[in-house]
Curated annotation (Swiss-Prot):
It comes from the Eukaryota. GO terms for molecular function: dynein complex binding; microtubule plus-end binding. GO terms for biological process: establishment of mitotic spindle orientation; microtubule organizing center organization; nuclear migration; vesicle transport along microtubule. InterPro entries: WD40/YVTN_repeat-like_dom_sf, WD40_repeat_dom_sf. This is Uncharacterized WD repeat-containing protein C16H5.13. It comes from Schizosaccharomyces pombe (strain 972 / ATCC 24843). WD repeats lie at residues 14-53, 62-104, 148-187, 937-977. Coiled coil: none annotated. It is found in: Cytoplasm; Nucleus. The keyword Translocase does not apply. Keywords: Cytoplasm, Nucleus, Repeat, WD repeat. Its main location: cytoplasm. The lineage of its organism: Eukaryota, Fungi, Dikarya, Ascomycota, Taphrinomycotina. GO terms for cellular component: cytoplasmic microtubule; cytosol; kinetochore; microtubule associated complex; nuclear envelope; nucleus.
Length: 1026
């Protein structure tokens, strides 16, 4: 029985609730418990059997499958490092004393089951995959992949001085591997397997039994435990059904847990080795919820408010109260810096990554500020002397905490200060030279209007009480200790922060020289308050205004498939907004009540990290109901449909209140503009595929009438304000949506609309210095637009734009590259025809290399059939290639053709073009425009063709027949005509044998010279004499 089947066959119902224990680890006086919910709890087990919950770690969203503890020492800090692994492959490294998540690592290969410490430098991860990942402990990075396993590997403890590492497998075999630790390479030395009964099942674990005898180990099968010596010699066995785990006690007693019982066995050596049953305890023992604690077997059960420790051999039950876990702290203040979100709660402060939160719905904190206690009322990061970033946190009780930012999203605690003011609502940092020697000043403003000043050495300088008036403005002078304080009752005070004196001040012109405004907080100005993202807490909703430029710069859309397209279908099937069918009252699936369409708002990012929908009176999380609904899907959906909401009559105020994401440079009238056009222009095909799938499925859910209204709305923007193409971002956004809808649903448009739109974009691409945006818009729906414009003009503009942006031709995420790819996918034959005819003839010779580069990209992305494509090559492209043979880009074109169509090739001088046509080899002599066909048919399917450098020999490989065929090109002299004619004959056939008949065999000609070639098919490498 394998681990997956064992997990699914467990009878206990606690697993389904996510509360049950999924892994346990003991280290010194600590007991670390991982749960199916992903939570990790750390208990301090004292000598009097008293359990104390000292820490909880929350980062995993899947069952914690394995835990390892290591001593940690760095920068004078001595701590315990706890490394946790969940089934999804997420690795987290925690520091116990500081509660810091020091590092994370994500594996994506299968179900990860076990974390194993190989030595002081390396950890190993095994699971339901045929490899072992090696992770260097010092930098927490994958440094090697141990392959060569034919079954799921099982690692178990071995002697440190051993030169060979044993690895067990489910069939009972054990391989001994030698390791070169410098090169991190592995070599299998020997394989052993004990002769055991096949009824025992499969091996699920190996437990060393050195306390019983040297070189002994218990092999845990699904239905028996077997004691082996040296992993090979059978000693004794004991049969039990549905075994889940086995532990060996210090006295040599084996404790065996099954799904329904716990059994204690003792091994006796005489008269012959056998196991003796000592005792048996019945009961449901959850999978992996049992361990050996203080040399005694114990089972753990977790409930919402407590965890129980059942001592099986003693019959006693201890418990530990978990009330601290059920106290959910409310968010009292939110603050952002770049893509980090700081949430001040009623019990402390934590920092999250907006990048992870927004894109992955992963609310795991990056850092916890454990020194901060009490209700956080204000915080801010300041740049002080020597460019140090200092985070200042204030609480309701009047305490201030100072942290310095370190590398790797870490913070160093500096100090804590008790202020004379309470309920701090504002902190200001003034850079000025004081007579005390400090170069800066922190000013804390209280709810009652009082002020407190500290210098940059965190010394309390002065306190200024208030009679209830609120501060409106502070005026600071660089070289004086005085600060002018202006109140809302028109009072002005001159406050000397060093001498702790205060006098009445007078307004004068000098006051205007420098000031810091701390006036009323203006919500409408939120995106411009800070350089980056910012956050606001209103009505228990954390509103995050995200700088989309920073977000996209931190993405790598080409390599990260973080959204499956099936998720889009599930998400759209779940959330169909009622405003799309405004004439029909719909009962909302979340709240179960009928509501007015104008009350719908979008929210992303509650304090718990869930995406939400917000209404005028209530908000509801949809993550639990729709598990594949991510914040990114929510945002993409509403970015497409928000203009329709506006068209339906939603007011600016209500809609702006519900939209959480804005660009920092947008005006209030541009609230409906999304990040869509920016992401589309700065992302690869993965992200663009997500957007297209999202829009395609959205259009399927919209009735024809609603779609017409949507198209009409976007046309309204673009036709009425088309002259302000570069002044209004909303026009660009409308054009992006229209061009995408054209590519997905052209039948929804009138012919007049398509003509107008395509002509408009073509004119913009010409008049705006071959504008990339207009070119990108035309490429979105090229298959449709090309019917209403002269495609040669557009392609001419495309080439001129390529000339201006040659570097973009090598950037797969650039606007230009994506435009060429989309046009190629849509109609590569038309693109190449235009390039070879109209465009190539109009260009000067120094521009033809750019055209050839575009040609190679078009060929690489074509989806045309070879028969149609081959006619274009012979009639249009070959003369151009032959005349430009000295240009380097010609070889890019020939390589692209050979890559896209492996059964076609060129010689090194680009004088002969060859291809396979229904078993016949055809050689086209480019200069003479003459076609030569082989005299004999190959009578097999040739997948790969390659020519010798001179074009005299051709090698073809057939994977189906496992055969290699060699043709010779020669000139036959005819005497009575006194001339020579070319001929193609099969010189030899070579049968290639592979080691395995069922392996996937993809043929390949690795290299070819004038006299020989190397062919690879399946597991065979053959060097052939031509």
């Amino acid at each position: 029985m394998d681990w997956v089947a064992l997990s699914k066959s467990c009878k206990t119902h606690l697993l389904d609730e996510g509360l049950d224990v999924s892994s346990i680890h003991c280290f010194d006086q600590y007991l670390i418990v991982g749960q199916c919910s992903g939570q990790v709890m750390v208990f301090d087990v004292s000598t009097d059997n008293h359990f104390t919950l000292i820490q909880t770690f929350i980062a995993h969203k899947h069952s914690v499958s394995s835990i390892v503890c290591l001593p940690f020492e760095a920068d004078g800090i001595v701590d315990l490092s706890i490394i946790t692994l969940d089934e999804s492959g997420l690795l987290c490294q925690w520091l116990l004393k500081t509660c810091d998540r020091r590092a994370t690592l994500q594996l994506c290969d299968g179900l990860c089951l076990k974390l194993f410490r190989l030595n002081n430098n390396f950890l190993a991860v095994t699971g339901t995959f045929l490899k072992i990942y090696l992770i260097r402990i010092s930098n927490f990075q994958i440094v090697a992949t141990w392959t060569g396993h034919e079954d799921w590997p099982i690692l178990f403890p071995f002697k440190d001085e051993a030169l060979l590492i044993p690895v067990a497998y489910s069939d009972g075999s054990v391989s001994l591997w030698s390791v070169d630790w410098s090169a991190l390479t592995f070599k299998r030395n020997s394989v052993t397997k004990a002769d055991v009964k096949p009824t025992f099942g499969k091996v699920i674990d190996v437990v060393p039994a050195d306390c019983i005898s040297s070189n002994y180990a218990l092999y845990v099968y699904s239905d028996a435990v077997v004691l082996l010596e040296s992993h090979e010699k059978f000693i004794a066995s004991y049969s039990l059904a549905e075994i889940t785990s086995v532990f060996v006690l210090a006295d040599g007693t084996a404790c065996i847990f099954t799904l329904s019982s716990s059994t204690l066995l003792k091994l006796h050596q005489s008269p012959e080795p056998h196991f003796e049953l000592i005792s048996k305890y019945s009961g449901d023992f959850p999978w992996k919820s049992c361990t050996i604690l203080k040399s005694k077997p114990v089972s753990l059960c977790v409930y919402p408010e407590k965890i129980t420790f059942n001592w099986l051999t003693e019959g006693t039950v201890d418990s530990c109260n978990l009330c601290k876990l059920s106290n959910t702290a409310a968010v009292s203040y939110a603050y952002t810096d770049s893509l980090n979100l700081f949430l001040g709660t009623t019990s402390g402060l934590v920092m999250f990554s907006l990048f992870d939160w927004y894109l992955h719905n992963d609310p795991a904190p990056l850092y916890s500020f454990t020194r901060v206690s009490g209700i956080v009322t204000y915080m801010k990061i300041f740049e002080t002397e020597h460019s140090r970033s200092i985070l200042v946190v204030a609480t309701k009780t009047g305490k201030a905490y100072f942290y310095q930012q370190l590398q790797g999203e870490r913070w160093r605690f500096l100090c804590e200060r008790a202020l004379q003011s309470s309920s701090i609502t504002k902190i200001i940092h003034a850079k000025k030279s004081l007579s005390s020697g400090s170069s800066g000043l922190f000013i804390f403003m209280s709810l009652d209007g009082s002020l407190c000043a500290l210098d940059e050495s965190y010394n309390l300088l002065s306190y200024l009480p208030s009679d209830g008036a609120q501060v409106e403005t502070l005026y600071s002078f660089p070289d004086l200790d005085q600060i002018y304080v202006a109140y809302d009752n028109f009072q002005l005070l001159n406050w000397d922060v060093v001498d702790q004196k205060c006098s009445e001040g007078n307004y004068s012109d000098i006051i205007d020289s420098s000031f810091i405004s701390i006036g009323t907080f203006d919500k409408s100005n939120l995106p411009t308050l800070y350089h980056g993202s910012c956050a606001l807490l209103t009505d228990n909703l954390v509103t995050v205004f995200l700088d989309a430029h920073d977000l996209v710069l931190n993405l790598n859309f080409s390599n990260e498939n973080y959204i499956e397209k099936t998720y889009i279908d599930e998400f759209l099937d779940f959330i169909q907004p009622p405003f799309l069918n405004s004439d029909i009252e719909m009962e909302h699936q979340l709240l179960g009540t009928v509501f007015d369409q104008s009350s719908l708002h979008l929210g992303v990012g509650k304090p718990d990290g869930n995406a939400i929908l917000r209404f005028d009176t209530e908000m509801k999380s949809i993550i639990n109901t729709a598990p594949n609904c991510s914040a990114l899907l929510l945002y993409l959906y509403f970015s497409l449909m928000v203009p329709l909401c506006k068209y339906d009559g939603l007011s600016d105020t209500k809609l702006t209140e519900g939209i959480l994401l804005k660009l920092k440079d947008l005006k209030t009238v541009d609230y409906s503009i999304s990040v869509l056009s920016y992401v589309w222009n700065n992302s690869g095909k993965v992200m663009q595929g997500i957007i297209k799938s999202m829009l395609s499925r959205t259009l399927e859910l919209i009735s024809p009438e609603e779609l017409q209204r949507l198209i009409y709305y976007y046309f309204e923007f673009f036709t009425t304000t088309g002259g302000e193409y570069y002044l209004k971002k909303e026009v660009q956004h409308s054009l992006y949506i229209l061009s995408l809808i054209v590519s997905l649903r052209p039948s929804a448009f009138d012919v007049s609309q398509l003509k107008f739109l395509s002509s408009y974009l073509l004119q913009k691409s010409e008049s705006m210095d071959y504008d990339l945006t207009a070119i990108r818009l035309l490429s979105n729906g090229f298959s449709v637009f090309s019917k209403h414009i002269d495609p040669a003009k557009f392609i001419y503009n495309l080439v001129l734009s390529s000339l201006e942006n040659t570097k973009d031709l090598d950037d797969k995420n650039s606007i230009l590259y994506r435009s060429i790819v989309d046009v190629s996918v849509s109609n590569a034959v038309l693109l190449l025809t235009c390039l070879c005819d109209e465009v190539y003839e109009q260009m000067k010779s120094n521009l033809r290399s750019v055209i050839l580069k575009v040609v190679s990209l078009a060929i690489e992305n074509t989806q045309s059939e070879f028969s149609l494509f081959n006619q274009l090559i012979t009639e249009k492209l070959l003369p151009i290639l032959y005349s430009s043979r000295s240009v380097e880009e010609v070889h890019d074109v020939t390589n692209a053709i050979a890559t896209q169509f492996p059964f076609a090739c060129f010689d090194s001088k680009v004088e002969k073009y060859s291809y396979i046509d229904d078993g016949d080899l055809v050689v086209y002599e480019i200069a003479k425009r003459r076609k030569v066909v082989s005299k004999e048919n190959a009578e097999c399917d040739i997948q790969v063709l390659s020519a010798s450098p001179s074009g005299d020999y051709f090698v073809g490989v057939s994977a189906t027949q496992k055969e290699c065929i060699i043709w010779k090109y020669s000139q036959d002299f005819v005497k009575f005509l006194n001339l020579s004619t070319p001929s193609l004959t099969i010189r030899k056939r070579i049968l290639l044998q592979t080691n395995k008949t069922n392996e996937v065999e993809i043929p390949e000609v690795l290299w070819i010279s004038q006299s020989s070639a190397e062919v690879h098919i399946g597991s065979t490498f053959a060097i052939i004499d031509l």
